[in-house]
């Protein structure tokens, strides 16, 4: 096997892609900071049980596992940063009020999530802990859309769902609850024949409600239909009210309601939202409420957040990240060295051309030159 080959769905990030990723990372983290979010940097490697406190079987399957040579315990390479941030909030910060945290780092997946997806994503996200009200969900939803607009994306479609609807239906019917995982699979895949089979012997109200969910998809008017077709339960009424408020917030964004979109159901406890753009089949960003995520660390707090993959965002973003620079000669000249240092201190990129290498530089567009005129070094257009 060639020594330069990489594993399947693993790739190097070359300069043109890397500078775009870094430009987007800086833009998004700066925007998070403008909202009051503090950055944290969890480790790439943790004890497996710490990484798998939430997310169900899917997260376990996506997590690389290895043995710690020091302790003999099983370690995991993180597949999702959110549980780590929950651990930091619950165990290390231990604050009483609202905490806003953000992050950006690599995650590893044992299997790609799509045909051409990478197994090494760069996950960036933001989370609010400590507020159970819808105000936190509204802020996170707005921040997610703000981040996508910063990346130059337009014609965004926001899909909204709510884990509380299915949870309420299963809580009132023990027989349905026993088939919860199968019902979740059928609803997520919009597999109506399987859904009909699974609900055939359930109570009439539960059967009718579960069979209605795949058809409750469309614009915000679907919520009115849902109120007539679903049982009048406090949890369902509250979920539909939340979705109505979330749907009314975005401006200039297409909003769709999908009460059968349950991806992440095992993880979420309330509103769920996904952002799509034209020409991209999968969601570019996902978020939602997950109030139970800190429970395994001894301190469950209300929590809501969103995340996205920076590599995928860079692939579809029209943002131009190629910077301008000043091309300077290389010479052992004190005046030249002082001029170069002064320009760099002022924030300019100055590239000194090494002797015998006059090729065009790809990383930066050298639109100016540092030249000597009348004994002084000055910058001129190229």
Swiss-Prot record:
Q: Which GO terms describe its biological process?
A: histidyl-tRNA aminoacylation; L-histidine biosynthetic process
Any one Gene Ontology MF annotation carried by this entry is: histidine-tRNA ligase activity
Principal cellular location given in the protein's record = cytoplasm
The UniProt entry's sequence similarity note says: Belongs to the class-II aminoacyl-tRNA synthetase family. HisZ subfamily.
Job of this protein:
Required for the first step of histidine biosynthesis. May allow the feedback regulation of ATP phosphoribosyltransferase activity by histidine.
Other remarks on record?
This function is generally fulfilled by the C-terminal part of HisG, which is missing in some bacteria such as this one.
This chain belongs to which protein, by name? ATP phosphoribosyltransferase regulatory subunit
| Organism of this sequence | Burkholderia cenocepacia (strain ATCC BAA-245 / DSM 16553 / LMG 16656 / NCTC 13227 / J2315 / CF5610)
